[in-house]
Structure formats: structure tokens, C-alpha cells
Amino acid sequence: MTPFLPDRSIAKRFDAAADRYEHHAWAQRHAAEALAERIAALALPAKPRILEIGCGTGLLTRALARRLGPADWTLSDIAPDMLRQARANLNLPARYLRMDGEHPAGLDGQYDLICSSLAVQWFGDLNAGLARLTRWLRPGGHLAIATLAQESFKEWHQAHAVLSLRAATPEYPPVADIRAGLLPGRVDSEQHVQSHHSGLAFLRGLKGIGATAPRAGHQPLNTAQLRAVLRQFDRQGACVTYQFAYGQWRKPRGVFVTGTDTGVGKTLVSALLTRAWQADYWKPLQTGLAEESGDSATVAALARLPPERLHAPAYALQAPLAPWAAASLENTCIDATRLTLPETAAPLVVEGAGGLYVPIDERSLIIDLIDNLGLPVVLAARSGLGTINHTLLSLEALRARKLPVLGVIMSGPPSDDNRRAIEHFGRIPVLAQIPQLDVVDAQAVDLWSKQLPTLDSLLSSNASR
């Protein structure tokens, strides 16, 4: 597969700067060391699989290698001469990959850590690019980045504004707006002030690191305008602020429980998995509260969950309807793109609403939420007549979106024929057949949860498929 390389002008600028990059990269060195300190505090496994986006000449790589020790490295950059320079600078066994990190391709599996220092600010859509990177994280894996935020180069912008001009430097987002899909995490920031001999020295420094690509739509200044800006910048003190934003996100170890339809046993399956794995539970979209106490209360009772392992729904609605319809009755607007997974060190079981094509809002279905959350699926299905068709259709829909499925759990009178057909044509294991239970209570959940495979075994099997 040929990596997606959308803006070759950016790559050319960094290629031209590769040999002299580290002579000018004082701010970049500071950010790399600060990010490496944050990464070193994460709970990473021994010899972690690491993917670095925009490795440049290896500043972050070296800072991490000193702190983490042996690792399985994949170092990527959009600029081939930067990769050449990194090879020369690093004494590490690593895979070097020319790739645009905003649209990753050519990768060989998932990673314990995906990291990047002062490269992702070149993404055309920062948050969308970060969300794509999270798909390459292993369950429990971390995404850690340093990027530029809104206050960066404010003195340079001020020197232009005084003259009613606009700077060519790109516009960076506020710290609060930086997100990595729907993963839980945090972004902190610091302001780093760098002094220069003059405005001309500042521009030469930017050229020295290849950071001269202008923002979209910029009209170049004429010579007189540029000289006036440089004089104003010098009068201001020839200092420039870098606002570094450090983002850290973790992909939970867990599953998304969805069903072939409504009323197929998703809540029982969720309770069984929560009990078996000592997991946290989250039902992000709860409807039907006018008629019952809700699935969160049911799972808490069945799985004997303490309050701290039960996460409140993001939306709790009264009508027993699909979330979109129920929300409209209450004049509530659901925004599925703003849902964020709970932050927890425990395994996490997320239960959906109805089947895959249940509407959440005017733009999103449950299958879109699964895609955005990035958790593998456990599919709840009936055991009886009609389940083969419903289950295979659901599996086909998930595969069409390249969404990982760990297995199917069937509920109702056991049918070996239906189980065999689903495993054969669906090419997926049936993890359990839960019979029709006379009494559904915590004791029954205790008993049947012991029949389920461990989360680690399911994740390992999925990785090998």
C-alpha cells in the first residue's frame, strides 16, 4: 500500500532542512524532552511496541530511548531525508517508514504507544488525524503528543497586527479543543519563550527547521511590508512564545456489547462480562426510563457492581424509543461525536442501544459510535429461529466497516445447529450459549460468568486473526 502523502511541499521543506535541523531546533528539543518525561510516567509494558509520527532527526526517539530502554520501534516521517538523518543519528534497531501520520498506512499491527513531538500541528485536521491514530492502539495503549496551541507566535502575530497585516504562520487550536476521538485523556500546556537576536534571525531559524509552509490562503508580504514587520518585532524585544500542548490519551481494555436486535439479551451479556472480568460498566445512551429503572441499575445488581465501577449515562431519556426519537420528545440534542469513554484502569464494558443501525442523532447510528469508540465488539444474539440471518447480517455490517468482533454470545434455548452455522458462515466464535434462565439474578450471573473466556484471551485471539 502506498502511504497517503497529501502535501509534498511540506515534505520538501523538511527534506531541505534535514542536515541542519538540530542546529536550530531549540524549542523542538525542549518539547521532546518534556513529552518524554510524561511518557516515561505511563504504565507501559516491557519492550513496548512504539510508533512515532514525524520522527524528524530523532530528538524524541533519543529522549525516550534513554528513559524506556529496549523497545520495538517504528519511526515514521513524511520527509525521506529526515528519515535518513534519523538513521544516522540513532543507534537503535528500528523500522523506518515514510508515511503521512495524518493518514497512516503500511503499518504492521497495533502499538502500545503512539507518540509525536511537534509534527501533528501540520495535520490538515488535527482532531480527525489523532482519531485515526487511535485505531492503531492496542487495548490499554497510549497516544501521547506535543503540538503547538493557540498562543504560539503571538508576538510575531502582534508585529503584523500593529501594521494591519496578517502573519503567514498557521493558526493553532485552543488547548481545550484538542481531542483524540472519543478516548479519555487530558491535555496540559506550557508557554516557552525563546529570544532571538532579531526578527531576521527568527525567520532564519524557522527556515532552518523547515517550518516555513504558510497557512492556507496567505498572501505573501512585499519587501517593504516584511521590513516593517521585522522592525516592529525587534522593537517588541525579538522574543517569541511557543505554547506547547501535551496530550495523553489511553485506549481502554474492554468491549462494546451490541445486539442483532432489541431485546436479544445485551444487558444480561453485559452483566455476565462485567462480572467475569471485574469490569466497569457504561451505558452511554439510556432510554425508556419512564417504564423501568434502566440497564445501569440492572447490571449493577446482577454483577454486584460497587458504585465506583458504574459510570452514569451521557444521556438518560424517558421514552422507550431509539435515542434520536426519544431525545426529540424531550427537546434534547444528542451529539454522538462528543461522547467520551470513561477514564478507568479497569476493563470496560460498554452497552449499546438496540442493534447496529439504531439512530443516535441526525448524523450517527450505533455502528458509527462503535467505530468512533474503537472498542472490539461482542455481539448478543438470540438462539432461536431466525438468528442465523440476523447474526450473519450484523457480522457482515461490522466487517464492512472493518470493526473487530471478538465473538457472539447467544441467549435462549440452546441450538447446536444455529451455533454451528454462525461459527461456520460468520467465521467467528460463539463464546457461550446462555440457556433460558428461570431466575435472572446475581447468583445466576455468578454461575454463568465463570463459563466465559478471559478478556486477555479474547484480545489475544483477535490480534492473531
Swiss-Prot record:
A single Gene Ontology CC term: cytoplasm
Cystines in this chain: none
Cofactor needs: Mg(2+)
Keyword field contains S-adenosyl-L-methionine: yes
Catalytic-site annotation from UniProt: K283
Family matches, as CDD domains: AdoMet_MTases (cd02440), DTBS (cd03109)
Keyword Cytoplasm: yes
UniProt KW keywords: ATP-binding, Biotin biosynthesis, Cytoplasm, Hydrolase, Ligase, Magnesium, Metal-binding, Methyltransferase, Multifunctional enzyme, Nucleotide-binding, S-adenosyl-L-methionine, Transferase
Residues given in the record as substrate binding sites: T287
A molecular function GO annotation: malonyl-CoA methyltransferase activity
Subcellular location: Cytoplasm
Chief place where the protein resides: cytoplasm
Pathway recorded for this protein: Cofactor biosynthesis; biotin biosynthesis; biotin from 7,8-diaminononanoate: step 1/2; Cofactor biosynthesis; biotin biosynthesis
Region (DTB synthetase), start-end ranges: 255-465
Family named by the database record: In the N-terminal section; belongs to the methyltransferase superfamily. In the C-terminal section; belongs to the dethiobiotin synthetase family.
Name of the protein described by the UniProt record: Biotin biosynthesis bifunctional protein BioCD
